[in-house]
């Protein structure tokens, strides 16, 4: 590379010298005319006599200040000679431009080749960074895949107690019943009954009757249910505004899901609320007046099934 640079420098120096020599030669080429004129003037002066006239009787040329008109006429002479000086100069620039372009091209090439290793030197650094990142990214992926494996075995463990509880209920051993009936000469209106049931979180479902579930949203196991006291004991929620009945019956089977005492308390409070909203009367399972002693009897029946 150093030898190539030296050769290029020598070529550039030779080109510059050639341009300078050509310029001086062009200038010298135009000087003989003036020089000849000057020499002829000197010869003519030697041939002139004491009065200033030559052999032909012509006197010496005198320099007179030029008038504006003469100055204007003299200017074109100068301009006419100007292209003679400009033309060789233009040729000099054309000659100087050719080697200058070549020198620039050759100087750019080593700069490109010198920069190439800089990029290649950075490439392995990037590869090493990616190589170190791969195992770091792989570790959380493995953990994310193992996480569901750890959770999966817990699902049957949660379901097993529910299956055991379902099997433990078996056949109903007792049924707790409450009646809400209308007063004499009146009926319970379906238009008033439906909003009351929705407020108490009842949901229309199986057997075309209303049910109270574990969740207030109407999901989960059924705690107790409510049917129409008049046969066939069903409801039509689409025609509740035209519906009327003598009464409704709330019932809960034992054993039941969850806390039986808590479920009975919810059922009893719901029956009281329906009776108050619709102007009805609360009765026990035998359609007798609901008393405190009747309540204690129901509680004992619940404890007997515990």
UniProtKB/Swiss-Prot annotation:
Q: Which GO terms describe its biological process?
A: division septum assembly; FtsZ-dependent cytokinesis
Transmembrane helix in keyword set: yes
Q: Superkingdom, according to UniProt?
A: Bacteria
Q: Where in the cell is it found?
A: Cell inner membrane
SUPFAM superfamilies associated with the record? Cell-division protein ZipA, C-terminal domain
Per UniProt, which keywords does this protein have? Cell cycle, Cell division, Cell inner membrane, Cell membrane, Membrane, Transmembrane, Transmembrane helix
Topology of the protein relative to the lipid bilayer: Single-pass type I membrane protein
Gene Ontology cellular-component terms for this entry are:
cell division site; plasma membrane
Record's signal peptide: none
Quaternary assembly: Interacts with FtsZ via their C-terminal domains.
Identify its protein family: Belongs to the ZipA family.
Q: What is this protein for, i.e. what is its function?
A: Essential cell division protein that stabilizes the FtsZ protofilaments by cross-linking them and that serves as a cytoplasmic membrane anchor for the Z ring. Also required for the recruitment to the septal ring of downstream cell division proteins.
Instruction: Identify this protein by name.
Output: Cell division protein ZipA
Designated gene of the protein: zipA
């Amino acid at each position: 590379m150093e030898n190539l640079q030296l050769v290029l420098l020598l070529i550039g120096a030779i080109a510059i010298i050639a341009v300078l020599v050509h310029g001086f030669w062009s200038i010298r080429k135009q000087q003989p005319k003036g020089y000849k004129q000057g020499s002829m003037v000197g010869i003519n002066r030697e041939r002139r006599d004491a009065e200033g006239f030559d052999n032909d009787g012509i006197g010496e040329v005198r320099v007179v200040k030029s008038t504006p008109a003469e100055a204007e006429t003299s200017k074109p002479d100068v301009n006419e000679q100007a292209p003679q000086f400009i033309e060789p100069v233009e040729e000099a620039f054309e000659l100087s431009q050719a080697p200058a372009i070549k020198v620039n091209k050759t100087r750019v090439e080593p700069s490109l080749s010198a920069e190439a290793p800089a990029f290649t030197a950075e490439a392995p650094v990037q590869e090493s960074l990616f190589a170190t990142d791969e195992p770091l990214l792989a570790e959380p992926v493995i953990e994310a895949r193992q996480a569901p494996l750890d959770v999966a075995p817990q699902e049957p463990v949660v379901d097993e107690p529910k299956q055991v509880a379902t099997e433990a209920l078996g056949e109903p051993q007792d049924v707790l019943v409450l009646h809400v009936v209308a007063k004499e000469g009146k009926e319970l209106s379906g238009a008033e009954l439906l909003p009351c049931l929705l407020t108490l979180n009842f949901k229309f479902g199986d057997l075309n009757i209303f049910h109270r579930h574990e969740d207030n949203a109407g999901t989960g196991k059924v705690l107790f249910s409510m049917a129409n006291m008049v046969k066939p004991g069903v409801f039509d929620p689409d025609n509740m505004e035209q519906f009327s009945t003598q009464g409704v019956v709330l019932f809960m089977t034992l054993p039941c899901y969850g806390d039986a005492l808590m479920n009975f308390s919810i059922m009893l409070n719901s029956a009281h609320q329906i009776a108050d909203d619709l102007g009805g009367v609360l009765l026990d399972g035998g359609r007798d007046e609901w008393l405190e002693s009747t309540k204690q009897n129901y509680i004992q029946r619940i404890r007997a099934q515990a």
